[in-house]
Amino acid sequence: MSLKIRLARGGAKKRPYYRIVVADARSPRDGRFIEKIGTFNPLLAKDAAERVTLDTEKAKAWLEKGAQPTDRVARFLDAAGLLKREARNNPKKAEPGKKAQERAAERAAKAAEASEAASAE
């Protein structure tokens, strides 16, 4: 049985509220779970203390038992100091896209032509 620490959605339409639960990976998102270990309210301000509540002792115990957190829950656990999340490296994100590179090359070519024309006169 593969265990996941994940979010189970609750709340009304357009008013999400999540429980942080330990559940079997095969069970539905909002379905049966083994234990509730916290809550997440995305409608609160990012610096609000009640935005994420987490029972750290229960979370640590489930991590030791082999439960795998989802990406979002891993962020919460990292913020709580229970899990070290490795930084993702995406070197292509910093460089401009294909069209922007083409435009920059065109601008550089026009600037070079203009400087050649100015120096020739």
Curated annotation (Swiss-Prot):
Q: What organism does the UniProt record list as the source?
A: Azorhizobium caulinodans (strain ATCC 43989 / DSM 5975 / JCM 20966 / LMG 6465 / NBRC 14845 / NCIMB 13405 / ORS 571)
The protein's UniProt keywords, in alphabetical order, are: Ribonucleoprotein, Ribosomal protein
What biological-process terms (Gene Ontology) are attached?
Answer: translation
Q: Which PROSITE patterns match?
A: RIBOSOMAL_S16 (PS00732)
Q: Which family does it belong to?
A: Belongs to the bacterial ribosomal protein bS16 family.
List compositional bias (Basic and acidic residues) regions by residue number: 85-110
Please identify the protein, giving its name as recorded: Small ribosomal subunit protein bS16
Q: Which domain of life is it from?
A: Bacteria
Mark out the compositionally biased spans (Low complexity). Answer: 111-121
Checking Pfam families in the record gives: Ribosomal_S16
Q: Which gene encodes it?
A: rpsP
Which residue spans traverse the membrane?
none
Single GO MF descriptor = structural constituent of ribosome
Which GO cellular component terms, listed alphabetically, does the Swiss-Prot or TrEMBL entry include?
A: cytoplasm; small ribosomal subunit
Which InterPro entries does the entry mention? Ribosomal_bS16, Ribosomal_bS16_CS, Ribosomal_bS16_dom_sf
Lineage start? Bacteria, Pseudomonadati, Pseudomonadota, Alphaproteobacteria, Hyphomicrobiales
Q: Where are the residues of the annotated region Disordered?
A: 85-121
